A protein has these predicted regions:
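Divalent metal-dependent phosphate-bond-processing catalytic cores, especially two-metal-ion Mg2+/Mn2+ enzymes
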Residues: 2-4, 42-143
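His-Asp-centered metal-binding catalytic motifs of divalent-metal-dependent phosphohydrolases/nucleases
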Residues: 1-2, 30-40
Length: 143
């Protein structure tokens, strides 16, 4: 997501599909599914694409969970200049866990997505608990 607009992502995706000789109707369906995935701005797909949309959505959300999701959260926060944690502002990477990551498990759309999300969600919960415990022990401001 960093460094790309919605339009530039779509252009890049179309270029890749053109090079792979993906037929235009399939390209349109892929773009529609991609647009349906966003956590905050997703738009519903046509009924005939809802299975594909559910699978891609779960895969995207699973990427944001677990150990890799934790790493991605702090990498993104660092790229945006956010502190790891600061009790004086909600503009910090740890807040993203409360705002979004810890809610992902309940939004899974497929049985397999729900199954995989259980373990990754537990990793997130354990990390946040341990982070807060250490923060309270150290009581330092991290940057």
């Amino acid at each position: 997501k960093l460094g790309y607009t919605k339009e530039s992502r779509q252009d890049l995706l179309c270029q890749i599909m053109d090079e792979a000789k993906v037929p235009r109707p399939v390209q349109a369906a892929v773009l529609e599914v991609v647009e349906s995935v966003s956590f905050t701005t997703g738009t519903p797909c046509r009924p005939e694409l809802q299975t594909e949309s559910a699978i891609v959505c779960d895969a995207d959300r699973l990427d944001a969970m677990g150990a890799i999701g934790i790493a991605r959260t702090f990498a993104y926060g660092g790229a945006k200049g956010r502190p790891i944690f600061s009790p004086s502002t909600k503009e910090n990477s740890l807040q993203h866990f409360e705002d979004k990551l810890l809610r992902l498990k309940d939004g899974m759309k497929t049985g397999e997505g729900r199954r995989l999300a259980q373990t990754r969600h537990a990793v997130l919960v354990q990390f946040v608990e341990e982070f807060k415990k250490e923060w309270n022990e150290e009581n330092i401001e991290l940057c």
